[in-house]
Amino acid sequence: MTNAAFLLLLTLTACVAPCPADAVGFEHLTPAKAAAEALRHRNKSKSKAFEDRFHPTYPSVCNVKKCAAREASACLRGAVMYQIFTRMFTPEGTFKAAERKLPELKELGVDIIYLTPHQLADDDQDPRFWSARQRKCGFGNPKNPYRQKDFYAVDPEYGSAQDLKDFVIAAHRLGMKVMFDLVYFHCGPKASFLTEHPDFIVRNPDGSPLLGEWAFPEMDISRREVRDYLYANMEGFVRDYDADGFRCDVADMLPVDFWEEGYLRCKALKPDFFMMCEGLKGDDQRLAFDLSYGFYTQWTMVELLKGAQPASVLRTAWEAQQRDYPKGFHWMRCFENHDFANVNPGEKRKEELYGHDLNAAMIATIFLLDGVPMLYNGQEIADASPQSIFSNRDHGGWHVDWTKADEPYALERRNLVKRLASIRHGNPDLFDAPVIWLETGAADRVYAFRRDLPGQPLTLAVNISAEPAAIRLEGTDVTVPPKSFVIRRGPNLQIDRKERKQ
C-alpha cells in the first residue's frame, strides 16, 4: 500500500466512533512508564470482594460513556472460534498433525481457528529471562512461545513455513478462517534484530534491557523504526500466509494507536480482516479491534465452577461490562484457554476437578451469551489431560488425549458442541442481540437469561448446585438438573445437555 493510500484510509476511518478525550491517558508516555502507570491503575482498588475485580485493567484516553465501538467484521456474526495450542494439540505438536484434524473441527461447527504463536521462540537458558511460571513448572524448557527470538521466522518445532501456509490453505478450503497470535510487547533476550538494532528495546540507564512484567525485554514502541518493523511483520502474515486476523497478546500494554495503524494497514490488504484484543481498555474497539477478551465473565465462570461464588455473580459481571465499556463493545467468551488451562505437574484440570456436567453448562453459557464463543484444545471431548505452555514432545510430552475421544462422556460433549454451534450458526443475532437476565427465585444457585431473536426466543437456565433446582421461569415451572442446564426454545420446547426433549 502506498503512503498516500494509507493516509487516505486513515482519514476516512479517523471519525469512526468519535471519542472526546478525557484528562486520563498514557499515550504520551514511554512504553515503560505507560506500563508502570497502567499497573498502578490496575491495582489501585484492591478488595476482598470478588466483584471489585470488575473494572478496566487500563485507563482509557476517551470517555467511555460518550464513545462507541466501531462495527465488527461481519464474519464474526454467528461464528464459533477454536484455539489450537499447537505443541499440545496433538502428540506430534506440528502443523501437519493439526492440519489432519481440521475436518473434525469443521464438522464440529468451528468457523475461526485461533493459532497460538508459531514464531521462533527464544531458547536462552538464563533463568533471569524466564517468567515465574516458566521456572515453576519444572519442565526446563527455555522455549516459551510468548518469548520470541524472531518475529518473522517459523519455529521448526511446529514445522516449516510451507507447513504453516499449507495449514492455512487447508483451513480455507474447509471454509474456516485462521487467526495468528502476535506478541509485540516484549521479545527474547537473544532476539535476532538486537545485533543490528540494539535500540529496538527499552534499556535501563546502564544499558541493560528493561525487563517487563514477565522478565522479558520490552520493545520500544515509541520508536518509529520499531513500529515499521512490526507493521511489516503484520502485513507479511496477511500477504504471504493469508492470515485472516490477529489475536494480540497483552495488547493494552502497547499504545492503542500502534494497533490502530496496524489494523488499517492489514485491512487495506484484506477487507474482511479482523483483530482480537487480550485486554480491557475502553479505547480498544474505537478502531483497532473487533473483539476483546470477556475477562469479567471468564473469571466469574471459573469461580462458579469452583463453587466459590453465587450464581448471580455472572449477571453482575455481565452488567459491569456494559457499564465500563463503550456502546457496541464485543467480547470473546471462554472460560478455558492456554493461560487458564495451564497447570503444573500433579495439578488437575477443570474437567476433572469440577466434573463434565458443570463444564458443559459453562460451554452452553458462552455459546448463548453475546459475542463470540471460543473453545480450547480438546474441550469438545471433555479432555482432562494436563496442559502447560512449556510442555511439548521433548519436555513432559503432554498433549490432548485423543484416545478417549470415543468415550461416552466425550461423545456426549461433542454432540452438545455440535448442537450449540448449530444454534449459533442459525441465529447470528446472538452476536449482539440484547441479553435479558431473568429472575429465578434461586439466585444463589441458578442464573438464567433470554435472547430475543427473530422467530422464537432462546432461554438458558444454569444450576450450579449439586441438587435439582425447581424454578419459576417466566411463568413456567422448570426443573434444572444438578450442575447442569436447560435451554428453552419458545414456550414449550426444552432441551438439556443430552438433548432430552420435554
What do these predicted ranges mean?
Residues 84, 105, 115, 151, ...:
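Conserved, mostly hydrophobic/aromatic
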Residues 66-96, 102-111, 117-241, 261-269, ...:
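Substrate-binding/active-site clefts of carbohydrate-active enzymes
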Residues 26-32, 36-65, 239, 249-331, ...:
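Active-site-proximal helices and loops of the catalytic beta/alpha 8
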Residues 72, 76, 123, 325-470, ...:
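Loop/helix patches that line or flank the sugar-binding groove of alpha-linked glycan CAZymes
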Residues 114-123, 181-190, 249-255, 278-282, ...:
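Short, solvent-exposed turn/loop segments enriched in Gly/Ser/Thr/Pro and often Arg
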Residues 5-14:
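Bacterial N-terminal signal peptides
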Residues 464-502:
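C-terminal beta-sandwich/jelly-roll accessory domains of carbohydrate-active enzymes
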Residues 79-83, 112, 175-179, 243-247, ...:
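Structural preference for beta-strand elements that scaffold enzyme active sites
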